[in-house]
Structures are given as structure tokens and as C-alpha cells.
């Protein structure tokens, strides 16, 4: 099943809902960063959460999620946009802890239960919008939920799941976000809360072949779900050799001379996707000459 996200309105517009299948997206991140199980689940959940938040944006608007906990996985940085594209990395990809008391991947142990959870939105205006909350769980889903309630002041239920196989491959990944709008009936909220308590984990549902639409039907009742949009999602990085060349020019003439004289070349690695870009000595000389021209123009 190809990865996609659905947006829905429910209960006469009093509930907004989103659900996503992201197995291929998280698999691509796992492959690119060679992550081990705990790191895969932590990075994967953050990618899925960022895609869900990104679905509330317009096409070119984008956001960054930073999870900076006190666990061995280190910081997780993920970008997403309104077109269903995401990219991200985890500082320590090689964390594989024992299963927790419930027999699940120990994401909290990898992330830590103290630290800062940050979302930065770039809506194409002069300034970005930033919100920050403490990490309350380290399980990622609960941290997204807390952020939405406190910083965005939108009561939400967010479920994120990543199922990792014994060979480190991703068996299933996905998530949902249910948002309560002003004026929602208490009986509706009670019904949804009961459903949330009864439904198996999202990753299990997706592994069993359920679609994002079916997940929402389970959570909200099929008769109440009006699907508005279906959008493909993917891991996609916008890095390029040209962009890194611009960054190399910016490091300065002395640094470029050192790369030319001592290393006779350079390699740039994108943190987000691990793509590598090689620059020959001749290319570096061209970049240095451009840096010199830029200096003279100033």
C-alpha cells in the first residue's frame, strides 16, 4: 500500500480528523540513516507526527519539529510541509534498547522523559512562529498531544506507531490526529474517548491491512466520517549539489583555500537524508573564485 494521508470532517464539523499510512516513508528514513529499532521508532513517530501537523498547513508552508530529550538517541529534527513531504534525522541512529514492560519498543528510554519539544512554523511571512513545551512522556505521540493542547490550544488525540521487524526493517508505520472543535458535544467526546481506549495500536491495524480511512471509521464511527481529501506522503529531501556549493562559498576564502591545498577536494553530507556530494579540486577553485568576486562586489 502506498503511503497517504486522509483528511476528514466528522460530527457535523465539530471534529477534524487525519489518518496516515507511512510505512514506506519511515522505511526510507531507516534505510538512509541505518537506524536501529529504538531510533527507528523514535524518528519514525516524529516523521509521522510532523506529517499530521503539516497536513493542517497550506502547500508551500512548512514546519520543523525538534525533540530534544535526555535519552541516548539525542536530538530528533524533522521538517514537513503542506504537500505531504517530510525529511528528518536522529542524532544517534544506533539505539536498540530492550523491549519495555509492555513488550513494545522502548521509545521513551531512547528519547528520554525530560527535555524540550519545539515546533517552528514557516508560513511564508517575515517571521516564523515557534511554540515550545516540555517533553512530558518521551513516547512522542503524547508529546505531540501535549504540545497541541498547551501551545496550539487545540484539544487533540494523536496516536503514532512504528512496528520494526527483527531485521531492523519497518513492518508498519502510521498515525492519526483527532481534533475537537469548539461546540463539540460532550457525548461525542465521550464516545471518541471510549473508542480510543478500545482500539488496538495504529501500527497493528496497518499491519493487518487496514487503510487510513478504515482507521478513522473505527475511531469515529463510519457514518460520521466525511473524507475531504486524500494526499500522498513521502520522505523527500530538497538538498542538492548547488545548495551545498552556495554553503561552501559562504564558509569563506581561507577555508576554501585549505580544502584546495590540503584536501584537494571536499565532500558534503546532508544531515537530513545522508546524500553525499563530492567537489573536486577544480570545482573548489571555481567556488573560491566566486567567493573572491562576491567580496569585491561588496
Curated annotation (Swiss-Prot):
PTM (free text): Under oxidizing conditions two disulfide bonds are formed involving the reactive cysteines. Under reducing conditions zinc is bound to the reactive cysteines and the protein is inactive.
Entry keyword Cytoplasm: yes
Subcellular location: Cytoplasm
Highest taxon, organism lineage: Bacteria
Cellular component aspect of the GO annotation: cytoplasm
Disulfide bonds listed in the record: 237-239, 270-273
GO molecular function, one term: unfolded protein binding
InterPro entries assigned: Heat_shock_Hsp33, Heat_shock_Hsp33_C, Heat_shock_Hsp33_N
SUPFAM superfamilies recorded: Hsp33 domain (SSF64397), HSP33 redox switch-like (SSF118352)
UniProt record, GO biological process: protein refolding
Keywords: Chaperone, Cytoplasm, Disulfide bond, Redox-active center, Zinc
Cytoplasm among keywords: yes
Family: Belongs to the HSP33 family.
Official protein name in the record: 33 kDa chaperonin
Name of the gene this protein is made from: hslO
